[in-house]
């Protein structure tokens, strides 16, 4: 069995796809507006790799109907061990101006950011960045100022306020363009499979 489709009143409401060993690889569930949930699974384990709210785009190419998905809403990305890696927010396929969260392997939040663009090679953040310790306590809470600098409040591992500082560069990456690329590549690799 490679796949199965479920119809209701001549309308497709769900699809499931399987690998050669019969393990589920993808499934979609639609509502009548053609929006739905896309779930993907790691190969051979049937552990969920991601779940996404999507808009479905159907078009005919050379007489064959092709279906594609546009991320629109929340996407959760999981590591192979089942722990949450990231929660991404999309609007019409774009991350721009929306909050994004990245998690430690222990399940605690690591970064809370607002995406400034969709460019993954030169990813930038804006407005607010919060970094956390592995215990879940806030490490640094930064707000972007009108002049582009960042006002950051620093805390110790117990949550006690330490100091406040003004940073010229974006506080997490300190201008290192590869920093966000490395984090995002892990997430994008899971979503691509």
Which positions does each model-derived feature cover?
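Glycine/tyrosine- and acidic-biased, solvent-exposed loop/turn segments at the edges of beta-strands
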Residues: 1-193
């Amino acid at each position: 069995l490679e796949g199965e489709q479920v119809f209701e009143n001549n309308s497709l409401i769900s699809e499931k796809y399987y690998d050669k060993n019969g393990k589920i690889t993808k499934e979609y569930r639609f509502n009548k507006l053609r929006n739905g949930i896309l779930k993907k699974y790691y190969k051979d384990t049937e552990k969920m790799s991601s779940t996404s709210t999507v808009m479905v785009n159907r078009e005919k190419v050379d007489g064959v109907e092709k279906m594609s998905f546009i991320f629109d809403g929340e996407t959760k990305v999981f590591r192979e061990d089942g722990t949450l890696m990231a929660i991404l927010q999309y609007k019409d396929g774009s991350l721009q101006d929306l909050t994004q969260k990245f998690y430690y392997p222990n399940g605690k939040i690591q970064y809370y950011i607002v995406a400034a663009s969709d460019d993954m090679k030169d990813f930038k953040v804006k407005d607010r960045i919060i970094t956390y310790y592995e215990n879940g306590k806030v490490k640094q809470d930064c707000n972007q100022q009108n002049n582009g600098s960042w006002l950051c409040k620093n805390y110790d591992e117990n949550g006690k306020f330490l100091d406040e500082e003004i940073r010229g560069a974006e506080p997490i990456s300190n201008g290192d363009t590869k920093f966000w690329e490395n984090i995002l590549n892990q997430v994008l690799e899971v979503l691509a499979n």
